[in-house]
Amino acid sequence: FPAHVKLQAQVEIFLVNAAECEPMLKVDQQLMWQQAARLVRGVQYAMTATGAREGVIALKEKYRRAIDALTPLLPAGIRLHILPDVYPAGDEVLTIWLATGRRVAPAALPASVGVVVNNVQTVLNIARAVEQQFAVTRRTLTVNGAVARPLTVTVPIGMSLREVLALAGGATVDDPGFINGGPMMGGLITSLDSPVTKTTGGLLVLPGVPSVQADALAAILSEDAV
């Protein structure tokens, strides 16, 4: 859902969903401690835009480095909410309930209960846009799995996934499979020539599997799966 549309809503609570519930992805937890002050400023800008009286950053208990970096920077009106280290903590509706006590009805938007939700990278981009008039031209993502050098890297939007894979030293297995995002909710990548977009969640490299299993996995991860 576009951030500029979300920020037009007038709500009571602005929530940063920083749970990063997908295994193997490390982007949000790393950005939170590396750019803690910018994240807090981004929350303040978003609160101003939406009229929110409270800002909440919801993150998992195990992200100790991020918690330690953010805690001393929190002004009045912004707080951390510590989520359990379980899946699916990070699901938007569940996170709203855990962090605010408000329940979003089926098919309703968070704004219906007075909440706007954004992710860590979006909030950081809000701060850059306000302070430096930066457009979103880069994406930070995790490259993990069967690669020579697992890493989190910031790359230009439009860079091919093949080039991203090369930054991690390439695959370490024969006939690998590739997932855009995490292993639970990510989608199969059919071509490494596909570009990085504003919504690319990560690049996971998995060992090859027999064709029958691969077909089953493709069906599970496809948009048409029931």
Feature-to-residue mapping (PLM):
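Ferredoxin-type iron-sulfur electron-transfer modules and their immediate structural context
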Residues: 139, 161, 171-226
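Short helix/loop capping segments that flank catalytic or ligand/cofactor-binding pockets
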Residues: 23-26, 91, 151, 163-165, ...
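Gly-rich Lys/Arg/Thr-decorated short loops/hinges at beta-loop-alpha junctions or inter-strand turns
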Residues: 14-28, 147
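Metallocofactor- and cofactor-centric catalytic cores in central/energy metabolism, strongly enriched
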Residues: 28-33, 58
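Active-site loop ensemble at the mouth of alpha/beta enzyme cores that anchors a bound cofactor
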Residues: 10, 87-117, 191-213, 217
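Histidine-anchored nucleotide/phosphate-binding helix
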Residues: 33-49
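Hydrophobic alpha-helical positions that pack around
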Residues: 3-5, 53-161, 167-172, 182-183
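Short amphipathic alpha-helices and their capping/turn segments at secondary-structure boundaries
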Residues: 1-12
